[in-house]
Amino acid sequence: MSGSCSSRKCFSVPATSLCSTEVSCGGPICLPSSCQSQTWQLVTCQDSCGSSSCGPQCRQPSCPVSSCAQPLCCDPVICEPSCSVSSGCQPVCCEATTCEPSCSVSNCYQPVCFEATICEPSCSVSNCCQPVCFEATVCEPSCSVSSCAQPVCCEPAICEPSCSVSSCCQPVGSEATSCQPVLCVPTSCQPVLCKSSCCQPVVCEPSCCSAVCTLPSSCQPVVCEPSCCQPVCPTPTCSVTSSCQAVCCDPSPCEPSCSESSICQPATCVALVCEPVCLRPVCCVQSSCEPPSVPSTCQEPSCCVSSICQPICSEPSPCSPAVCVSSPCQPTCYVVKRCPSVCPEPVSCPSTSCRPLSCSPGSSASAICRPTCPRTFYIPSSSKRPCSATISYRPVSRPICRPICSGLLTYRQPYMTSISYRPACYRPCYSILRRPACVTSYSCRPVYFRPSCTESDSCKRDCKKSTSSQLDCVDTTPCKVDVSEEAPCQPTEAKPISPTTREAAAAQPAASKPANC
């Protein structure tokens, strides 16, 4: 090589070509400043670089891979890129290679090369085409240098994606660290068309567990995300023919366990949004207020209910929601809501294996089923008490404090009671929400009188449903009665009313006024 680069009389070879018409064969050539310390091979060009006279003497890149943006050639081959120098596409060619990109020249910014090429695609989403290479192409990762390892060559693939840029410019390879996202691409050179429904590639995100990447099936994505080192679905149990199919696994405590979807969920391991109380699912019990809309899919429940996660059961109707319980032991909090007036009949707790066996309606504690925190439960109604037509009833206000564990109560409507303490059997009183501490019940006591109305006009009475502020027996058809002087229809002497029964007694003025007999 004649001349000297220090004379400033030689041409500077562009990075896009090794053989140019601006430099005559045998003239001085200035090597790029970044690679002057390396050994370069200069080949004599013939016929204006139209033919090759050298044998294939390809060597490894003479500069580091991290900064290898300089050309490396053996035979004089001109490979003109289809993008500008500012876009970072600098081809490196060896031997005769056809520069035919997979898309139009105006839309493709990646050349076709034999050796490794570092390029940064600058095309848009609709025009992002993968390069067609003979062996391999290394692309600059789309993430920062600190989070990506050294680029690794991979087999080429022709893909016309319809997805975003993030799936077109991902680092490829298998030598990935725990902090490097890896894109698993098909190893065949056959065209792989990504459909719009499955355009996302297989991406392994960093996690505290070792994530395993598998090749997708028919462009189906499989996303591996961190799962707190304990994946919800460790191994597929339904089907192992394809990694994209669903697998059977125990549902997460943070997800509903009684849904209409199939038991086999997609094989996607996601991070738990909350710490589960227990890892086994609980069961949903349909309310008896309305017929169940979906068949019961009760599984083996656990002995605890997650209270910090999402609701396990959704309310099927505003009448009465489904009750989430567990067996064979008691949950942390056991709540049963009362039915509003929309329900035609009083609601009784359904008896099913998914509920505690010893918790019967109307009872809140027993030797096995004893609550440890506030709860609500139903008090079922009893049958109507018949009223006699020849006997009048005078209301007498008296508080009734029944033991909690003394069997069924005789109220006509389902009350929702609340125990704000750990109840023990046979406590003296219980409370009703929005009611006094002790429920005031009215009983009908016969009062002697002599009716003068005929048998056809006799007093007809009917028992209506009672509440804590209503009478058990109410006249439906008042009639005129001749009260004898011996036993007139007089009000009974007013008795002192405790503060507990003051609300109910105020609603019944019969204790201070004569009865309309």
Swiss-Prot record:
**Molecular function terms from GO:** structural molecule activity
Q: Where is this chain compositionally biased, Low complexity type?
A: 504-517
11 X 5 AA repeats of C-C-X(3): where is this region? 73-307
Alphabetically sorted, this entry's keywords are:
Keratin, Repeat
Region annotation (Disordered) maps to 483-517
Q: What InterPro entries does its record include?
A: KAP, Keratin_matx
List GO terms (cellular component aspect). Answer: cytosol; keratin filament
Q: Does the keyword Oxidoreductase apply?
A: no
What ranges cover the sequence repeats?
Answer: 73-77, 93-97, 128-132, 153-157, 168-172, 198-202, 208-212, 228-232, 248-252, 283-287, 303-307
Q: Does the keyword Repeat apply?
A: yes
Which branch of life, at top level?
A: Eukaryota
Please give the family membership noted in the entry: Belongs to the KRTAP type 16 family.
**Protein name as annotated:** Keratin-associated protein 16-1
Organism annotation:
Homo sapiens (Human)
Q: What is the lineage of its organism?
A: Eukaryota, Metazoa, Chordata, Craniata, Vertebrata
Q: What is the gene called?
A: KRTAP16-1
